[in-house]
């Protein structure tokens, strides 16, 4: 037990040192009024380990549209979504939001433009109400509950012993995966940012939870700039544009219809997933 504690402590120290080694990101707290298009212009990126993830990525995610990132595992989908919000600084090329280079925008100011709904939801040992209020710390209880209802949180919250004031445990351990994700979506409703970064998070859910979350997401993304990491092709059939990432580059981009007709990488992925879904024991 003591050895495990020592190993855990050393690992945490190593992670902290890695964070401290990163230069402090700075930038202006002023934003342009040119909308919220996200543009990747010949972007290249490598982690500190030297591993090159993106080689030459260019595409535009337009305001009011859903842009879906698809591709094989390790193709760069998750990295692209995080670079859009300047989780890290790129090695070459340029990323702009509303015409402004993200490397010149103060990180806190930039993040104010984003609502982020990823698979790994971070929750705290507090009530449902306070976990949602993280989306907007100045929101009233009424505003928090209104956002929660848009995300279908009320479907389970009002059945709990203390309702909205129920403590959900460390990282939401008292809740199911679907319930945790609905809280994450409620935060995004409460923040009401113009850009949504979304990691499709319904693959491991039961049918009821998946339906509730998809309904909530449809409400959330209306009229926003939406960049979604897609794992299942059927969920992006309604996207305005699909960007296929493979081996750190854009292999294809276009509407779902155009890419299906092109019969390239995307069409092949659709075919494979359709065959997988239709498979059954015989």
Question: For the regions a protein language model found, what residue spans apply to each?
Answer:
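Cytosolic ends of transmembrane helices, especially the final helix of ABC transmembrane type-1 domains
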Residues: 1-19
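ABC-type nucleotide-binding domain
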Residues: 26-282
């Amino acid at each position: 037990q003591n050895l495990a504690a020592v190993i855990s402590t050393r690992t945490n120290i190593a992670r902290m040192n890695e964070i401290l080694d990163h230069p402090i990101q700075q930038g202006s707290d002023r934003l342009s009024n040119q909308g919220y298009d996200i543009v990747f212009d010949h972007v290249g990126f490598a982690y500190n380990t030297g591993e090159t993830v993106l080689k030459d990525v260019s595409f535009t995610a337009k305001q009011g549209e859903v842009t879906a990132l698809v591709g094989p595992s390790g193709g760069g989908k998750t990295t692209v979504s995080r670079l859009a919000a300047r989780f890290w600084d790129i090695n070459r090329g340029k990323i702009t939001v509303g015409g402004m280079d993200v490397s010149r925008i103060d990180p806190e100011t930039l993040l104010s433009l984003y609502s982020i709904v990823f698979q790994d939801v971070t929750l705290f040992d507090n009530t449902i109400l306070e976990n949602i209020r993280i989306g907007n710390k100045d929101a009233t209880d009424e505003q928090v509950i209104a956002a929660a209802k848009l995300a279908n949180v009320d479907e389970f919250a009002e059945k709990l012993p203390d309702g909205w004031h129920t403590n959900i445990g460390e990282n939401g351990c008292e809740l199911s995966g679907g319930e945790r994700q609905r809280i994450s979506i409620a935060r995004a409703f409460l923040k009401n940012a113009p850009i949504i970064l979304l990691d499709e998070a319904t693959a491991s859910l039961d049918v009821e939870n998946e339906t509730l979350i998809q309904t909530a997401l449809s409400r959330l993304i209306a009229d926003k700039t939406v960049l979604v990491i897609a794992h299942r092709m059927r969920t992006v059939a309604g996207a305005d544009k699909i960007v296929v990432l493979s081996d750190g580059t854009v292999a294809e981009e276009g509407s779902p219809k155009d890419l299906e007709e092109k019969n390239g990488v995307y069409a092949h992925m659709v075919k494979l997933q359709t065959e997988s879904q239709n498979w059954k024991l015989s």
